[in-house]
Amino acid sequence: MKFNRIYGLFLRHFFLITRSFPRILDLIYWPSIQITLWGFISNFFASHSTYYNNAVGVILTCAILYDFLFRTSIGFNMLFLEEIWSRNFTNLFIAPIKIGEIIISLVFTALIRALIGLIPAILLTSPLFGISLLDLGIYLFFLFLNLYMFGITLGILVLSLIHISEPTRLAT
């Protein structure tokens, strides 16, 4: 495995993300809307019932963690499918690039995509709802690491199922 090839593929996807304002807006907009929506729903429940007093923090934390898992899996899948849809796979395999190098570059790019959506969501929860996810400390890092690995694994599983079910459509 060559680092230069992995870095080149990473840069290709990174430039596709950063040079397109709609892509960046999509990565930031939906997590922010989800946090705002679940925050206000949680506040409504907490203000109308004593049973849900501590639900705001739990629901917002779960929404952020779920969104990170979802963004990681979707980010990995979309990057791979964009290679297929743009008919770039032939070009990739003409070059001396191995499957492992492609997957590693997609893994790192999926992390960047997930972080672009995660950071604004975490920053919104503190001023709007008084919930800080960073209070979990080092446990938060390990939780995000596990969610990230599960999201990538889920992405690989979904892509393999897509490839098994429709191998001829992906190639054309």
Briefly describe each language-model feature range:
Residues 1-165, 169:
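Hydrophobic transmembrane alpha-helices and immediately adjacent juxtamembrane helices
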